[in-house]
Amino acid sequence: EERELSLFYYAKLVLGVYGYESERYITTYTFKDNNAIEYIGGNNPYSEYFGNLHAYLTILGGENITVSGDTKEFIGFGGEAEKPKAMEFSNLSNKTGSIYDPCLSACSRIKLKPHEVKEVVIVFGQDEQENIIKVIDKYRDINNAHTALENVKKYWNDLLGGIRVSTPDRSMDYMLNGWLL
């Protein structure tokens, strides 16, 4: 039988040095093309470090993306990230603006036939606004997403894999090799 799933992604926005200082200046918004949401974005124009950059989030490969820029909608009033309120619903409200506790959250629907496999790409980044659609369009091709993932893995392996140690404790080896050395 066919199954329909909702895939969610959530990111709390700081866009400054300290969230408690910067969140009042953050505005979230949606970017639409032909009345369809392409991505949710956020910007803090007063940030010395992030002022000209926009954080953005989208989910590629699903259907009917909905978004929210309100942490209280996603997590729930007094809620916790481990059990977000949004999981009780199949989509988000598309609320954005400067009056909310800022976040970028997105939901996309996925329909699966029996034994069917689908890949989705979550694109979450920060860039100048005019570059965002170019980045999203690049990763609409799943092969570009796979290549980027392999490049990131190679980068970190090359950077962190120069020294290898072997101890009697395998868990210590995992911790030391690549991260602490």
What are these regions (language model features)?
Residues 1-3, 110-128:
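Short Pro-Gly-centered flexible turn/kink motifs
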Residues 2-90, 104-106, 132-162, 169:
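Polysaccharide-binding surfaces and accessory modules of carbohydrate-active proteins
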Residues 7, 100-102, 114-116:
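Solvent-exposed loop and beta-edge segments used for protein-protein assembly and interaction
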Residues 12-15, 127-128, 180:
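Hydrophobic/aromatic-lined pockets within catalytic cores
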Residues 90-100, 181:
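Active-site-adjacent bridging/hinge elements
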Residues 94-97, 107-112:
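Beta-strand-rich interaction surfaces with strong enrichment in secreted/lumenal proteins
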Residues 129-130, 176:
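Short amphipathic alpha-helical leader/targeting segments
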Residues 161-181:
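Extended glycan-interaction surfaces of carbohydrate-active proteins
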